[in-house]
UniProtKB/Swiss-Prot annotation:
Belongs to the transketolase family. This is Apulose-4-phosphate transketolase subunit A. Pathway: Carbohydrate metabolism. It comes from the Bacteria. The gene is aptA. Its EC number is 2.2.1.13. Its cofactor is thiamine diphosphate. It is an enzyme of class 2 (transferase). Signal peptide: none annotated. Keywords: Carbohydrate metabolism, Thiamine pyrophosphate, Transferase.
Length: 281
């Protein structure tokens, strides 16, 4: 898929995200917005997935380790065709299959997540299974940067290197903010690239706010180098909604009616601009 088409899809997903968080009156909207470009790139360009066959054995696997940002995953699954708009609209309602963290009740979700630090271990297991079965699917794991304070991640990192899991790609959403402030104030992560390189991983960095760089980086991965891959995705918390960008309090939050209208207006203007540009080509 062309970069311009992916950019448009990401903005449509962004608008839908704002809608469902506002309707549900709950959501980790800041981190949702920072990882939305990566999710769009994965589901609409990089991964092999089939909405009509969500359990197809050849499918690539995705693990949302930063499970509190599940709203971004829901709107991506809706846009891809795994779940309907009617289902997504039930977020926050009693009896809905959509909860505040991913669960396998939802088509397209591989594993229950939300307890931070566990997703990479699951991803390592999935990648090992593919190697043992001589299957060619890839496993992708999206982690938060605040999540890097969890020690279990580094046990999984050692295992990924030990078993030469070059079919495993971990992505860190490096937005530099968590619920209590900046990541550097809470637990410094400036050595991130060096530490993962020391663990034997193939480390790449990308601008997660720019779709072109995301696609270029994913496509540059060497899946034959006998090393697991780590992508450090430099992003902006609250990306795409001006009054949320770079503000820690939007780790979890719901816009007021006025703020909601402002967010929808901002995103809608970008959608209209991108549609005109795409139609003009």
């Amino acid at each position: 898929m062309q970069v311009e088409t992916l950019e448009l899809q990401s903005e449509k997903n962004r608008k839908r995200l704002v809608e469902i968080v506002y309707k549900a009156k709950a959501g980790h909207i800041g981190g949702d917005l920072s990882c939305l470009n990566v999710l769009t790139a994965l589901y609409f360009d990089i991964m092999r997935v089939w909405p009509d066959k969500p359990k197809e054995t050849k499918r690539d696997r995705f693990v949302m380790s930063k499970g509190h940002c599940v709203e971004a995953l829901y709107v991506t699954l809706e846009a891809k065709g795994f779940i309907s708009r009617e289902v997504t609209d039930t977020l926050g309602e009693f009896g809905s299959i959509l909860s505040g963290h991913p669960t396998i009740e939802v088509p397209g979700i591989e594993v229950n997540t939300g307890a931070l630090g566990h997703g990479l271990s699951v991803g390592v297991g999935m990648a090992m299974a593919a190697k043992m079965d001589k299957a060619d699917y890839k496993t992708y794991v999206l982690m938060g940067d605040g999540e890097q304070g969890e020690g279990s991640i580094y046990e999984a990192a050692m295992a990924g290197n030990q078993y030469k899991l070059d079919n495993l790609v971990a992505i860190i959403d490096r937005n530099r903010l968590q619920i209590s402030g900046t990541t550097e104030e809470v637990m410094s992560l400036e050595s991130m690239r060096d530490r993962w390189t020391a663990f034997g991983w193939d480390v790449l960095e990308m601008n997660g706010d720019e779709m072109e760089d995301i696609i270029r980086t994913f496509r540059s991965i060497d899946y034959t180098n006998k090393k697991p891959h780590l992508l450090i995705s430099h992003t902006t918390k609250g990306k795409g909604v001006s009054y949320m960008e770079g503000i820690a309090k939007w780790h979890h939050g719901v816009p007021t009616a006025e703020q909601y209208e402002e967010a929808v207006r901002e995103v809608s203007e970008r959608i209209e601009k991108l549609e005109k540009e795409n139609n003009g080509k």
